[in-house]
């Protein structure tokens, strides 16, 4: 497709879908957002009025049949990702999908098989940290031997407490805190550890504030350990109850040094010095922290479609992230270490 714009349709216009739609329409020169799909009439109207999307649909099969479509961006509920990806591939389309591929390893493998039948189609699962400038710089340093051989990763995702209860309502279909939040940390750990194969995991946690999570067996704070082949290890921390804001931090330890990404979650380079001391404001949410990476992600997808530019994450990577996250959720449920 070299030299032409990729005609993309987006499925899902909720909180994250609207952000992806805006990026595709306004911040991705190689793409043309030609269609959108949502069962919610107000969301379809927003896509037309705010982004100038010419055609909207209430159902996904109709979107797949849009004339001249090259690709789809899937930002539907996680439980629908795998079937949506496979249907798009069967329709001959390139696919970008939000993470994870699925909450079931078997469905991830079905997606891999469907993609193998269409090697001429690009499929990208949105593990956005692989497109973040700081994470990419850190990976290049690790790859080039700056800290020797990496053997340990500590990675955390911490969100500001949301008293509205949004994620409590979302929790029953999220797969749990490790599938929803820590899956980014899991993918980052495998990336920095050279795609190492996980062998055993253990997870624990608590409900510190949001009692409603107990109804579906979820947590608002969790910690996990993962043992990889060759003696490599990773620790993951997830929290939904921070008072200060969003924090994504990854530490990689090697035989000759250590590096950290995001150790200070400051929103800007401004510091305030007053009677309370010296302080800086924190990044409020994950989107402010990774907004540029989300833009880079969709542009990388378009470059892969148009020019065959290699992508930094594979379907196998996405499957392994799900495999580890699911094992962590099982560890929570069974109160024991679990083989992966």
Q: PLM features: residue spans?
A:
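C-terminal helix-rich "cap/oligomerization" subdomain common to oxidoreductases
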Residues: 1-5, 71-74, 300-340
């Amino acid at each position: 497709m070299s030299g032409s714009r990729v005609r993309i349709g987006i499925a899902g216009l909720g909180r994250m879908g609207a952000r992806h739609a805006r990026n595709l329409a306004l911040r991705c020169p190689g793409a043309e957002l030609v269609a959108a799909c949502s069962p919610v009439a107000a969301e379809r109207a927003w896509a037309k009025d705010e982004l100038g999307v010419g055609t909207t649909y209430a159902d996904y099969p109709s979107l797949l049949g849009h004339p001249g479509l090259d690709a789809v961006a899937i930002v539907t509920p996680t439980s629908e990702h795998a079937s949506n990806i496979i249907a798009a591939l069967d329709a001959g389309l390139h696919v970008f999908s939000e993470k994870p591929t699925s909450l079931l390893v078997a469905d991830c493998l079905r997606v891999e098989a469907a993609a193998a039948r269409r090697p001429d189609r690009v499929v990208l699962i949105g593990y956005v940290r692989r497109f973040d400038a700081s994470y990419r710089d850190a990976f290049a340093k690790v790859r080039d031997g700056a800290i020797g051989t990496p053997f340990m990763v500590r990675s955390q995702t911490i969100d500001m407490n949301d008293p509205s209860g949004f994620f409590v309502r979302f929790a029953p279909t999220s797969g749990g805190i490790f599938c929803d939040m820590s899956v980014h940390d899991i993918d980052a750990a495998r990336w920095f550890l050279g795609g190492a194969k996980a062998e055993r995991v253990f997870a624990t946690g608590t409900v510190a504030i949001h009692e409603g999570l107990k109804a579906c067996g979820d947590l608002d704070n969790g910690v996990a350990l993962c043992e990889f082949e060759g003696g490599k290890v990773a620790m993951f921390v997830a929290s939904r109850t921070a008072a200060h804001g969003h924090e994504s931090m990854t530490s990689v330890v090697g035989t000759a040094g250590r590096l950290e990404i995001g150790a200070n979650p400051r929103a800007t380079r401004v510091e305030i010095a007053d009677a309370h001391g010296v302080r800086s404001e924190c990044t409020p949410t994950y989107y402010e922290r990774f907004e540029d990476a989300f833009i880079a992600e969709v542009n990388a997808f378009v470059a892969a479609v148009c020019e065959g530019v290699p992508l930094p994450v594979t379907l196998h990577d996405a499957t392994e992230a799900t495999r580890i996250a699911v094992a962590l959720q099982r560890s929570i449920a069974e109160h024991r270490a679990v083989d992966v």
